[in-house]
UniProtKB/Swiss-Prot annotation:
Predominant localisation class: secreted
Residues in the signal sequence: 1-23
Family under the similarity heading: Belongs to the non-disulfide-bridged peptide (NDBP) superfamily. Short antimicrobial peptide (group 4) family.
Cellular localization per UniProt: Secreted
Residues with the Phenylalanine amide modification: F36
Tissue-wise expression: Expressed by the venom gland.
Task performed by this protein: Peptide with unknown function. Does not show antimicrobial activity against the Gram-positive, and Gram-negative bacteria tested, as well as against the fungus C.albicans.
Maturation-removed propeptide residues: 37-68
UniProt protein name: Peptide Smp13
Superkingdom of source: Eukaryota
Length: 68
């Protein structure tokens, strides 16, 4: 009985590790596909919205100083 329980626990742990590693590998693969895909190398700069008319030059200078 103890042996069966130990085998069950080991199987459960290995199955859990396989499930989690499969999800991680799938996310990595999707990231690579998105990076090198048809639209993957497009401009993903989301900071363009910062430079609208409502932000003053002093604000932009302050942001540049923070980013350095």
């Amino acid at each position: 009985m103890k042996t069966q329980f130990a085998i069950f626990l080991i199987t459960l742990v290995l199955f859990q590790m396989f499930s989690q590693s499969d999800a991680i590998l799938q996310d990595i693969w999707n990231g690579i596909k998105n990076l090198f895909g048809k639209r993957g190398l497009g401009d993903h700069d989301d900071l363009d919205e910062l430079f609208d008319g409502e932000i003053s030059q002093a604000d932009i200078d302050f942001l540049k100083e923070i980013m350095q």
